[in-house]
A protein has these predicted regions:
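Structural and coupling elements of P-loop NTPases
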Residues: 1-363
Length: 363
């Protein structure tokens, strides 16, 4: 999993996978991890051996319940792939992940087309202004038609959904791109990258993840069109990483709290600027109840396993031990004064735990 000095990444990118349930999102993640050399063979949801569905309940039910990550190299970039739940009951878990994404891949079933939750996800991606690639899966099933599906994507999602095999469609999304196409017969990679980053176009790829069809093309597209405008600093007004004068100051956004099998509390965060080092003193809390705690350990997870590092740089997603008072959405460092985006979705299921009188709920 980690990177050697020979493969030191030029940039760190976080890419989220989102989908309506049963669209083949986890199967796509298995294909991506297989083709990038992270796993020896793709697992299957129905076999209960998917790399990222590693909780017993997930394997038992065949669904993703918790967002999890895997790390792989793609060209000169280190990519953190965040697999999110597709089931509507766990949408709040998915939405918390959006605030730390640089790009997203929306998976659509070619057999079912744009479904209700697909539109919800699309609206969320627009709300958080996340550049989005679309992968139309299950194109090997009888009755699927690429032309009809692309037409549906344009009608129900956005007219700027473009087939990346049709350069003329790309050119119509921007006046400068059209000039390039008319003069040179193609649109430059830099122009396409900027159009994707600005959400002017949404690249569409078609395939069948179970058979690894179209997955490499998707990876090639991400590797080619993800620009250098990421992993510099997080601008809450834009909900994305942007360059500014505070790039050397530490900043981070917490998106998840969990515990490892040993009971250690893990604060999952994205480093938005500067860097975080082991034993760094972090501050947070309200003015009336401030806290200061040290980052005991910095972990980079990939599936169930992790490696510890001495520092995490801007753009990296890590889990930190030793922090007892952090909460999802909290900003640390220069992010402390920036309000997190208020979640649009709420958990469908709610539980309340009652402790016996002799038990202190705060400990």
């Amino acid at each position: 999993m980690g990177t050697t000095s020979e493969t030191k990444p030029k940039r760190y990118i976080s890419v989220g996978l989102l989908a309506h349930v049963d669209s083949g999102k986890t199967t796509l993640s298995e294909g991506i991890l297989y083709l990038t050399g992270q796993i020896r063979k793709p697992g299957r949801v129905d076999h209960g051996d998917a790399f990222l569905d590693n909780y017993a309940l997930e394997r038992q039910r065949g669904i993703t319940i918790f967002s999890k990550q895997a790390v792989f190299q793609l060209g000169d970039s280190q990519v953190t792939l965040l697999d999110t739940p597709g089931h509507v009951d766990f949408s709040a878990e998915m939405e918390r992940t959006l605030q730390v994404l640089d790009y997203a891949v929306l998976v659509v079933s070619g057999a079912d087309g744009v479904q209700g939750h697909t539109r919800t996800l699309w609206n969320l991606l627009a709300r958080y202004r996340i550049p989005t690639f679309i992968f139309v899966n299950k194109m090997d099933q009888p009755g699927t038609d690429k032309t009809l599906i692309l037409k549906e994507l344009k009608k129900k999602l956005d007219a700027s959904c473009v087939d990346m095999e049709a350069p003329e469609d790309i050119a119509t999304g921007d006046e400068h791109a059209l000039e390039e196409y008319l003069e040179a017969g193609e649109v430059s990679i830099d122009t396409i990258s900027q159009m994707i980053a600005d959400r002017q176009i949404f690249p569409c790829y078609f395939g069948a993840a179970l058979k690894l069809q179209g997955v490499q093309e998707l990876l090639d597209g991400i590797g080619k069109y993800v620009g250098d405008n990421v992993s510099a600093n997080y601008d809450q007004a834009d909900n994305r990483l942007q360059n500014n004068g505070d790039a050397q100051q530490f900043g981070a956004r917490v998106y998840k709290i969990s515990r490892d099998p040993q009971g250690n509390r893990l604060t999952h965060m994205k480093i938005t600027s500067g860097e975080l080092k082991v034993k760094s003193l972090l501050k947070g809390g309200q003015v009336s109840e401030p806290w200061e705690e040290k980052a005991d350990q910095i972990r980079i997870y990939s599936g169930e396993k992790f490696e510890t590092v001495q520092q995490a740089k801007a753009g990296m997603i890590c889990a930190v031990t030793g922090l007892k008072h952090t909460f999802p959405g909290e900003g640390l460092g220069i992010e402390a004064g920036k309000q997190a985006v208020t979640p649009m979705l709420e958990p469908v299921l709610n539980y309340q735990v009652y402790f016996p009188d002799q038990v202190c709920a705060s400990t």
